[in-house]
Amino acid sequence: MPELSFLSPKTTVKSSPIQGRGLFATQKIIKDEIVAVKGGHIFNREALAAVEAMLGSAEIQIGEDLFIGPLTAEEREGSMIFSNHSCNPNIGVKGQIVFVAMRDIEPGEELTHDWAMTDDDDTQMECRCGASDCRKVVTGQDWKRKNLQEKYRGYMSWYLVEMIAREFGQ
């Protein structure tokens, strides 16, 4: 089965100290270089519940009521980008599905993004990223935090940028 997502040939997937498996640089990655493109099927929040019940979390949010991800167990592995959450990430979002380096990344570094760049939901989780500026608890509403909006300017999902403009006039 063909892969649904693209991972840069400068990366590899291996065990992560953050959680499960992660995406790691095998070669130097330059700022704004594409490191992953999330692929899959487009579905709404109602369908998301059924997909998550069957596959667990394997999607990313691309609109207020739109998600992209696998629909079957066979597609799950090939749709993953293996980017764990970090409160001090080194990759961010351009558009809705393209992940790029926010700075130069050295070989051996784990590629991480902050879920505040992509998620708008009611979830909450204890953070284990280990960053010096770790928020300890990550929520699906963190995108509303002014400090994160400023920190991730240019690296947040398009739909969140639009929501910020509507809600906060930015």
Residue ranges and their predicted role:
Residues 2-91:
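Catalytic cores of histone-lysine modification enzymes
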Residues 85-170:
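C-terminal SET catalytic tail plus cysteine-rich post-SET Zn-binding segment of SAM-dependent SET-domain
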